[in-house]
């Protein structure tokens, strides 16, 4: 049975916890923090890699919008369209706090055939 992209994603949602649903060719990748204060970041990098582990996109703290308890990056349409339609990518967030504490978060990115990023799964 062939599931449409939307149905596949609904099925996946039942299996794993969602970080954020992002729709469109200029998606916003959003991370919310409950313990760490993003204002204390001295460095933060968002890295997207393809299935083979090749880095295809990297954004730094200068590209981020830092909220009270969150950090987010907006991908440009060109960046999103540069990803392979229907492809699977991994996304890693690494950060360093003023006191030297380090942290990381890993997630899978799923692209639908029309190059819209529909969801981030952790």
Residue ranges and their predicted role:
Residues 2-122:
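Contiguous segments within soluble domain cores/interaction surfaces
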């Amino acid at each position: 049975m062939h599931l449409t992209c939307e149905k596949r994603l609904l099925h996946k949602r039942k299996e794993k916890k969602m970080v954020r649903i992002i729709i469109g060719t200029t998606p916003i990748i959003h991370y919310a923090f409950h313990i760490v204060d993003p204002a204390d970041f001295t460095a933060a990098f968002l890295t997207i890699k393809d299935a083979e582990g090749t880095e295809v996109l990297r954004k730094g703290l200068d590209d981020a919008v830092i909220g009270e308890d969150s950090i987010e990056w907006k991908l440009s349409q060109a960046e999103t369209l540069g990803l392979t339609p229907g492809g699977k990518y991994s996304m890693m967030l690494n950060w360093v706090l003023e006191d030297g504490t380090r942290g990381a978060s890993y997630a899978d990115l799923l692209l639908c055939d029309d190059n819209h990023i529909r969801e981030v799964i952790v």
